[in-house]
Regions:
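Alpha-helical membrane segments of multi-pass proteins
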Residues: 1-182
Length: 182
């Protein structure tokens, strides 16, 4: 039976991940002086992910319109990651980078992050994988997690404020290349 297009879905994985991220952020924000706009950006990023995957959008995407599924992908890979990263203070981002070590430093280099973004988008949208993901909830969750991850990796060089941060024109070119090629 096909559900009502206005019915809400319940995807516990992304609700739980959103809750864990919110609690971790709240703890870190309590120790630092985080401006309200960073808190709002982080909350909006979590709301986009949880809302895209636990609302009528999910029902419509899964049972009615492929276009809505593509909108979900854009919400969780293109819109939520920059909001989540902007929500982090420079000190929080530096702590994450330190925790990630060399591997994190490597994958967030623009010359590595851009190919990861492109290969990720293309791989997820290969017809066989895409069709399988639309029929298998576990694969669909894996697809959504991958989109969030590649989104965070792609957006890190744009949002980063490290000593080796990209200049504004290079950030614009990087974003242009990423969106034109994907």
């Amino acid at each position: 039976m096909i559900p009502d297009p206005y019915s809400f879905t319940f995807e516990p994985l992304f609700i739980a991940l959103g809750a864990v991220a919110a609690v971790a952020y709240a703890r870190a924000a309590r120790r630092a002086d985080v401006p309200w706009w960073r808190i709002a950006a982080f909350a909006a990023g979590i709301a986009l992910v949880v809302g895209a995957l636990n609302s009528p959008l999910e029902t419509i995407a899964a049972h009615y319109l492929l276009l809505v599924h593509l909108l979900q992908n854009v919400m969780i890979a293109d819109w939520a990651p920059p909001l989540l990263l902007i929500g982090l203070t420079p000190a929080m981002r530096a702590a994450l980078a330190r925790r990630g070590g060399r591997a994190f430093a490597f994958v967030t280099r623009p010359q590595v992050a851009l190919p990861i973004w492109l290969v990720g988008w293309y791989a997820i949208h290969l017809a066989a994988f895409y069709d399988a993901a639309l029929r298998n909830a576990w694969l669909l969750n894996l697809e959504h997690l991958a989109l969030i991850a590649i989104g965070l990796v792609f957006w890190w060089p744009v949002v980063s404020d490290t000593p080796h941060a990209l200049s504004a024109p290079v950030r614009i070119a990087y974003l242009g290349a990423g969106f034109a090629l994907s």
